[in-house]
Amino acid sequence: KNKKRLIPTFVMLNFCVVTSHEEINASEITFLKDHLKAERVDVLGCCGVQFQVHPDNITEELKLERSKKIDINFITEDERSVHLLASDMDGTILEEECIDEIADLVGKGSEVRSITAQAMKEGLNFDESLQKRLALLKGAELEVLEHCLSKKINVRPGAVTLFRTFKKHFGKTASLSGGFTYFSDHIQKELEADFSFANVLEYKEGRLTGKATGTIVNAERKLELMK
């Protein structure tokens, strides 16, 4: 029963890193060690364990677990030398899309989602889509953002463990978001991420102007930042 909640997030040529949203106990570690025929076990934290293992030792039982939404991936030893973990924020680190939550609170949820759907269907570029959606939020009070952050936004289970473990053992971490710094600055602190980039909402006299200031963090900008 317990082993079903374990989530192997990625398997390398000579290593298998297992993470869970709950504490991994000694019996679960022993189960995985035996079935992987692991030569070495390194406990990365209460919710993470690394096994030195050969891919041939992935058993049929663990392959069966893969069909139950467990993600098992192989990469070469050369590819293992990863030094940067970069992730989107909205809908990735966070369970929600911040702009949708803000829009819901000001009665513009369906309109904002309609623009998003149109952009995906008709190829409207991100900058145009963002400008149209932000225009619908014009006049919203900053208290709406505060309420959204404290009551509506949830960090996805495992995200904090992933970021902190990667930072401790591998390299730098970054959040690259097409969302907003109002939220990403708070999330960066919780993740203990090294870097965080997002769009800056413009406001005057405590209300949103319906615009963003500075360079828009779109797909091209994210690529530039990673370089």
Q: Which stretches of residues belong to each language-model region?
A:
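Generic structural marker for isolated residues within well-ordered, non-membrane alpha-helices
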Residues: 29, 61, 99, 184, ...
